[in-house]
């Protein structure tokens, strides 16, 4: 199993990136308001990332540099296709994301986790710092 982290920076990469996010984060949750043209995707300091397993796109995440001087990165819009969930793909994605973030000077990652994803992040060493009922804020030092 070879999981690769790719920047979503070509036409095929963007198509796969948006298809995975639309399906996992919107369609499966009964939402229809996905916007693939949202300007945050192209802001300086935002890194839309695509993960492929043996050449097949299986997951996405975006790393936003919240405060580059303080070394803080925000993990956003994490999505793994359902058929690849609970197979170690999400954990491997987070490991590769941490390595990538470290190359950008990130020392701490934050994420507003879906309530049902909190145990996943806790297993990976994240800690809740704001237990909001909708999306708890979690953090993990990486540097």
Predicted regions and their residues:
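Conserved beta-strand in the GNAT
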Residues: 50, 56-65, 72-79
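A conserved beta-turn-beta hairpin within the catalytic core of GNAT-like acetyltransferases
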Residues: 65-76, 85, 131-135
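Conserved active-site tyrosine of GNAT-family acetyltransferases
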Residues: 21, 121, 126
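Conserved GNAT acetyl-CoA-binding A-motif
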Residues: 94, 101-114
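Conserved acetyl-CoA-binding loop-helix of GNAT-fold acetyltransferases
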Residues: 80, 86-99
